[in-house]
Every structure is written in structure tokens, then in C-alpha cells.
Amino acid sequence: MQRRLCLSALLGLTAVAGAQAPAGRPFTLGRTYQLASRALGTTLSYQVYLPPSYEDAEYAPRRYPIIYVLDSPGAYRLVTGVVDYQITSAALPEVIVVGISATSPERDYTPTHSLIGADGKEASDLRESGGAAAFAQYLREELIPRVERQVRGTGHRTLVGHSLAGLFAYHMLLTTPDLFRNYLFVDPSLWWDRREIGRRAQAGLSPPIDGGVRQIYHATADEPPSSLFDPTEHNAANRELTALLEARRSPNLRVLVQHFPGERHGPVAVPAIHAGLSWFFRGGAPPFELYLDAARLSAFHRAAQADLGLEGLPAERDVAIMAPYIMAMPGRRAEAEALLRLNAANYPHSARAHVQLADFLLSAADTVGARTALSAALRAVPHHRPAAARLARLAPSGRRAAPQKQGR
């Protein structure tokens, strides 16, 4: 029976392989770049995802937190998928994502030289292990400076690492703790070299020396023993270090440890990355009800976003998206108007914010207010065509125009 099923599957794959895929345009999340590294003596690639408003000229330029993801392009695809969906759902502030590639994870991510693998046996592919110091130099002196000259970052950085990449992320925490604000560890390979990272953490894990806030999210899986791998040492090393993390927790060193029952070492990255990023950026995504009160929304951002390196203002794009929803709610036009006026005041150089306010005022037949908003749009961007066209259509000053539908 099993043989027939395998044969049927093979024949099905053969039929599919012979079919011509329909023509279409590639769909990608980001761009790939090359960087020649002196520290590593080779050229590596890195990927960059930009959030929706970054290249939209209709929004005022701003800066964004940056998430650096080890094990690119695989882990980068996962993180950008999660991030892009959460941004679209207004569950995460807009961020930049950078994928970091390594030529040999067994060399680049391991802090010490060791020939002993996860199964406790000697492994020939570990002969070049112990290259983490050089890879850390590449990140610190070459990649991060290059990226942050290339994009508009706030200086607020997050590092994400899974498995051996999580081991390397701990190496970064212990050697250059102030390089990143957030550290997201997914079931890291802390068994390495007889728990070498755990021994170093006993002496070296402390609150940040720059006086800022550091956040650590550590996720663990529920890997069962198998003929290929006994996770006993792996799990014990993770329990040992997470206990230390929780003991060292302080106002400046925030820690969240989360175990995922039933999730194995590889797939646990999916829920862990979603949960970790949501926790890190919880201050950047206000609940919907705050958009019904412009004053409370502003207070939320002033109080919560300092840790994110943001401006402390509601994001222009988020307000632009939420305002029409609120306007469509029965009896909420006043709240929508307050939100649009807040956006225009917060982003005076954005023609889009002024035009959106003008459209709202025109829908209420407030020609005078709309004229004022459109004039502000043209002061911000003198040749802004949508603003100029709307202003030209307005009746002479003092007359009331017929209500118009909202448009861009």
C-alpha cells in the first residue's frame, strides 16, 4: 500500500513538472545587496525590506527601527512575512528588516572552536568552528554602518537568531550588549562547547551600561528525543540560561521567556518570532479604541515610543488608514476630524495629510476650511497636483461647495 502511494505521488509530481507555469511578475519582499568584507575576506549578500510608507512620496520622510535577522535568506523570508502582515494589520509599527547571510554557520556563528556536535560526537564539519569574533566584527564595523548609511534608521536595533544563529546572538549580547536594543532568541544552540555561553553569561550578563533599556525574548521548543538527536543537553542548557535571565531581570533589563509545548526546534520559529516582535514593539501599536480619541492617542505614543527610538507621534500612515474607518462609523465624524487635524499638525510637510483633511471638510461642505487645508498642502509641496486640482475646483471664497466624495 505504501509503495503504491509513493508511486502515485511520484506520477503526480511528474505530471505537475510537465505543466508550464503561467507567466507573471515576481513578488518579492525587499532587495538583495552585496558587501565585500575585509573582516571575513569574502563577499556576502544581505537583504533589505522597507516598510510601505518608506518609498511613498506622499508621506513625509521619517526614520524607522531596524530588525537584523541572522540566517538569511531563510529566516529573513519568515520575519519579513510576519512583519509585513502585522504592519498591514496595524499590529506593529513600520520597521525596516535586514537579512544577514553567513557563508558557513558552523564557523561564523560559533564563539569557540569545538569538534563536538549536538549529539555529543565528533563532527568533521566543525573543523573551522570558532569564527564568531570575526563575524561580529563584520556586523559591527561593516554591515551595520553600511546599512544605516543606506536607509533611514532610528538607531533602535533588534537582533533575531534561531538555533546556531541564536547562539551567535547570545555572543553579541555578552560582547557588545549595547549594539542592539532587543535580542530575540529562538531555541538557541546553547549546548555548544559544553554550555560555554552559559558559563560566560554567569559573569557577563548585566543591565545595559548606557543607561537605556534592553529587552530579551527567549523562546524554547519541545523537541522530543529521536534516533538522530537527543535534545536532553540542548534543553537543559536553555533551562539553565533562561533561569539566569529571569534572576537578572531589572527595570533596564526586561526579560520574557516563553516555552511552546508541542513545537519542534525548526517550526517553533514561526510562533516565536511573531510573539517576540509583538512583545518588543507593543508600545508602537495602539489598540483601535485609542484612535477614537486624538488626545489619548498622542499621549500613548509620547509615553510608549521613547524605547523604540521613534518621534513619539502617531504614524502618519496609520492615522491616514484609520481615519476613514472611523468616519464611516455612525456618530464618529467629530472623532475622525480630530484625528485628521492631528495628522496635519504632526506632519506639516506632508501634502497628503492636508489633502486628506481637505477632502473630509469638503464632504461636510466646509469650503473655507478645505481651502485652508489645500493651501497648507501647496505650501508643503508647491507643485502637488491633487491639492492644486482640488483648489482650482473650489467655488470662490465665501460660497459653499456641494459635498464631495473622499479621494486621494
Enumerate the predicted regions with their spans:
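Hydrophobic h-region of N-terminal signal peptides that target proteins for export
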Residues: L10-A19
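N-terminal export leaders
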Residues: R3-L7, A364
